[in-house]
């Protein structure tokens, strides 16, 4: 039964999402319908949590605008999401970054992982798997 549910859910899951984790800064392009027009609105912020699995999987993005913190929850299987871009990779040691809610400005910064570090780690893990 579980395999059947998982197979049905796979049909509804989007396949064009990039790989991102908690702590990454993402830019989410959302389709917004206003009367008879449809436009794309961009929401950029830090992923503070990823929750759930299957079609119920969601991620929460937090940004600060004019000194006010704004959080928005996006389902992975949402047809109104046009695309998701990862702008920065963050290095965090927590699965949920709720502590960012109390922090403002520079205190809310997250250490960034550079692209060459990501490639180096991928090569090292690939080499380790080949040696086993």
From Swiss-Prot:
It comes from the Bacteria. The keyword DNA damage does not apply. It comes from Persephonella marina (strain DSM 14350 / EX-H1). Keywords: Ribonucleoprotein, Ribosomal protein. PROSITE patterns: RIBOSOMAL_L19. InterPro entries: Ribosomal_bL19, Ribosomal_bL19_CS, Ribosomal_bL19_sf, Translation_prot_SH3-like_sf. Belongs to the bacterial ribosomal protein bL19 family. This is Large ribosomal subunit protein bL19. One of its GO terms (biological process) is translation. GO terms for cellular component: cytosolic large ribosomal subunit. One of its GO terms (molecular function) is structural constituent of ribosome. This protein is located at the 30S-50S ribosomal subunit interface and may play a role in the structure and function of the aminoacyl-tRNA binding site.
